[in-house]
Amino acid sequence: MIGRIVQILGSIVDVEFKKNNIPYIYNALFIKEFNLYLEVQQQIGNNIVRTIALGSTYGLKRYLLVIDTKKPILTPVGNCTLGRILNVLGNPIDNNGEIISNKKKPIHCSPPKFSDQVFSNNILETGIKVIDLLCPFLRGGKIGLFGGAGVGKTINMMELIRNIAIEHKGCSVFIGVGERTREGNDFYYEMKESNVLDKVSLIYGQMNEPSGNRLRVALTGLSIAEEFREMGKDVLLFIDNIYRFTLAGTEISALLGRMPSAVGYQPTLAEEMGKLQERISSTKNGSITSVQAIYVPADDLTDPSPSTTFTHLDSTIVLSRQIAELGIYPAIDPLESYSKQLDPYIVGIEHYEIANSVKFYLQKYKELKDTIAILGMDELSENDQIIVKRARKLQRFFSQPFFVGEIFTGIKGEYVNIKDTIQCFKNILNGEFDNINEKNFYMIGKI
């Protein structure tokens, strides 16, 4: 079926078809002359459909011929995507040749049926001490990652990818939504150097691409992750940045003629976010655990975009510049980060009590810092001096050498299981290492 372009509004293109030949919603249309795909969004009457362009509309003109493919946008899925960079259409953009795929999947899929989903309180061991102790990941859960530039978001993501691949025999999918091209490029080459590239699929919709690409690229990556899950794997899904997904939706919504809601966001914000997040779930075959980088506009947590995202999260990890300045990596703030899974019924009484004791010591140390700076340690009570010394040891013990950081630090990476993590922190709290210098706790795995 062939139609003709009748109107172009930025990324929005209106196409007229003959009566009884109107394409379905989400059908892919193709403009051969420009090698450009469109996706049908609305049927607006008079045999006209309104579409999103998944590419630049520069040079398009009215009355160009448009072909209805009679199919939705399909992306290659499976092991053929590992180690490759794909765009929103599932085409490789890494100059490493074509992807030979036996199977393609639509980017718009329904979430698993309730009867197919598996709800468990199983904790996903990451091998990173501070995460496993204070903000454990739920297998199949959703984790929000807050952090500015240069505090270690990328290196943390790379270590998680490595640990899931090597220790759990799983795989990862990284979706760059509105990514800076430089960041995506750096991420690719750093993972190549760290030998984890063959365990991850990369799907990029870069910052310079039209809003249609940035809005749909998350769905392309999600379809690839879902296929790995159905293959029986534990999948770690990274989305960077979930805010830019919302922003792309805002741009498209205005062009589609929808009335904006609070702060200018699209009226369908909650629905769009829900459709994306509901697909991230565990089934009888495997699990998808997602780590989502979240930008908070003007540090306003009540902004509709982050507040809509928060409702879906199980854990929150905050990367702190103050901790990074102390040279403690990963620079995760133990007092700001939290997890709903830190519950005695899920992690056990011992884990819960030790985690709370660690937080108490660190909070007390934080409160005493001003006193120490003015009067010195000697003016503190004997009990407070013990708390401060142990808290400093705990703080340094949160540092950990990463496998993916070996090429930078020269220190061999360490994977620490949850059992060892709990025991080591318990020993520090009990005073078994009170006579050992705090420097000895820096950049080690288990004691």
UniProtKB/Swiss-Prot annotation:
It comes from the Bacteria. Keywords: ATP synthesis, ATP-binding, Cell membrane, CF(1), Hydrogen ion transport, Ion transport, Membrane, Nucleotide-binding, Translocase, Transport. It holds the Pfam family ATP-synt_VA_C. GO terms for molecular function: ATP binding; ATP hydrolysis activity; proton-transporting ATP synthase activity, rotational mechanism. Its main location: membrane. ATP binds at residues 147-154. InterPro entries: AAA+_ATPase (IPR003593), ATP-synt_VA_C (IPR055190), ATP_synth_F1_bsu (IPR005722), ATPase_a/bsu_AS (IPR020003), ATPase_alpha/beta_chains (IPR050053), ATPase_F1/V1/A1_a/bsu_N (IPR004100), ATPase_F1/V1/A1_a/bsu_N_sf (IPR036121), ATPase_F1/V1/A1_a/bsu_nucl-bd (IPR000194). It catalyses: ATP + H2O + 4 H(+)(in) = ADP + phosphate + 5 H(+)(out). It is an enzyme of class 7 (translocase). One of its GO terms (cellular component) is plasma membrane. The keyword Transport applies. It is found in: Cell membrane. It is a peripheral membrane protein. Its EC number is 7.1.2.2. Belongs to the ATPase alpha/beta chains family. HAMAP family: ATP_synth_beta_bact (MF_01347). F-type ATPases have 2 components, CF(1) - the catalytic core - and CF(0) - the membrane proton channel. CF(1) has five subunits: alpha(3), beta(3), gamma(1), delta(1), epsilon(1). CF(0) has three main subunits: a(1), b(2) and c(9-12). The alpha and beta chains form an alternating ring which encloses part of the gamma chain. CF(1) is attached to CF(0) by a central stalk formed by the gamma and epsilon chains, while a peripheral stalk is formed by the delta and b chains. Produces ATP from ADP in the presence of a proton gradient across the membrane. The catalytic sites are hosted primarily by the beta subunits. This is ATP synthase subunit beta. The gene is atpD.
